[in-house]
Amino acid sequence: MGQQQLLLIILGVIVVGIAVAVGITMFTDNAISANRDAVTNDLVNLASRAQQYYRRPASMGGGEGAFTGLTFDRLSTKPSNSNGRYLINGAVAATQVTLRGVGREKVNATDTVTVDMRVTPDSAVATVVY
């Protein structure tokens, strides 16, 4: 085989190797993004239930204008699903509660997808932690 043919084979192997590495990186980034979106979507649903609790009269099992007394059991019977696990993060105040979703995908060696959602009576704001 001539030198030119060997050089073309080596160049082809390098190009294929780079393409595979880029493809793996893109797949991982997409999986993280999809998990983050799914966790955020679940948190929006839980935030809506928290706001329902806030508005519901105490006689019907609600907070009657306060988040005080809200537990995760009042939001959902399942604290986890295929997207991740969910919890009330920190103390529940009368006018706000923070929900946390921890996803299944690892962002780096030590951290997984994590999203916090601060819920008030009229809004819910998501913050990406990882």
Q: Predicted regions: what is each one?
A:
Residues Q4-I10, I14-I32:
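C-terminal juxtamembrane segment of a hydrophobic transmembrane alpha-helix
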Residues D29, S33, R56-S59:
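General structural signal for alpha-helix termini and helix-helix connectors
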Residues R55-Y130:
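Periplasmic/extracellular, small/polar-rich flexible segments of pilin-like filament-forming proteins
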